[in-house]
Amino acid sequence: MKNYRAIGLAFTFTALSSLSAFAASLPGGASTLQETYQDWTVSCQSQKDTTACVMRQEQSSAQTGQRVLTAELRNVAGGKVDGVLLMPFGLDLAKGASLKIDDTAGPNLTFSTCLPQGCLAPVSFDAKQVAALKSGTNINVTTTALSPSQPVAFKISLKGFGAALDRIQALTK
């Protein structure tokens, strides 16, 4: 069985090539850090004088134990949050996906590429949406299965989102 944590870390620090680096160091001079904030995990890597941090939530199928969704986000300037959703194969990529923060419409997503682990959909939240994420309950993701063509829904819990985001902001100052 594949080690999805290792795949996730490799994905974090290679697939997100636009990941901003900040002149900061991790507590105790550590080169890596991983902390959990309810349903979110903060992962950081420090090299020389730069530290890169992301927050991640992975969801697995209760029946098979296989990963079905990974949300990976990072803070950017201006109170914005950028990232990517890694979703399973078998989706109608041309139709993309739509997001709602609880019941409020969020950004529509376009799939950018597929990797051996699944298909990527970049996501960006503006400062107003980030405030809604911090006070919200779920990100509701809706997309369409390819065959048979039917809606597929995912819920990304926002428990711990605010604390995880605050932590990566503090670690990358």
Swiss-Prot record:
Signal sequence extent: 1-23
Xref: InterPro entries: IalB_sf, Invasion_prot_B
Keyword annotations: Signal
Ranges in coiled-coil conformation: none
Statement: the UniProt record of this protein carries the keyword Signal: yes
Family: Belongs to the IalB family.
Protein name: Invasion protein B homolog BAB1_0368
Organism per entry: Brucella abortus (strain 2308)
